[in-house]
Amino acid sequence: MFIFYTYTFMLKIALSDLYCHPLPEKHRFPMEKYELLPRQLVHEGTVENSNLFVPGDLTDAQILAVHTPIYFDKLRSLSLTKKEERRTGFPLSKRLVEREINIAAGTVECAEYALSNGVAMNIAGGTHHAYSDRGEGFCLLNDQAIASRHLIDTGKCNQVLIIDLDVHQGNGTASIFRDDPSVFT
C-alpha cells in the first residue's frame, strides 16, 4: 500500500514600493535588491504576481511592545543625533521611517499567514540589528522582534524560535529577548 500526502500551500511574499528607498549615490547598501528579487522570482516562474502582497498598517502599540517610546519618538520626529543616524547606516528621512514601519508590518502579516498556511516571507525583512532603544547596521526597527511579540501577545503562539541565517548575529534581536524565555534566538 502506498500512501501519498500532498501539502499544498501558497507562498505569500510581502513587497512594497517603500522597500526600495532612494539612497545617496554610491551608498554601500544594495537597496535595488528589493526591486530585482521579486522581479526575478516572477520572471523565472518561481512565483506569480498573486503571491505578492503590499503590507497593511502597523500600530504604534505593536512597535512600542518592542521599542522604547523615547527611541520611537526620535525616529518619528527625525531627531536622532548624527551619531545615532550614522550607526543606522542610512540618512534619516520621513520616508525611511515609513519604510521601516512597513517592513515590520509585512513581517507581522507574514508571520500570521505562515501560522495558518505554512510559509510566507518578507522581501525586506530581517532587520535584526535594531535594538529596543536604537538602530544599527541598516536596521531601524526590529521586524522579527515586533512580529514575535505580536504573535505571543495576541495568543497566536506561546513561544517563538528565530532561526537567523545571516552571516552576522542578530544582535538586536538577541538583546531584546535576552531575558524572555518565550523567544529563542
What are these regions (language model features)?
Residues 5-185:
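HDAC/HDAC-like amidohydrolase catalytic core signature
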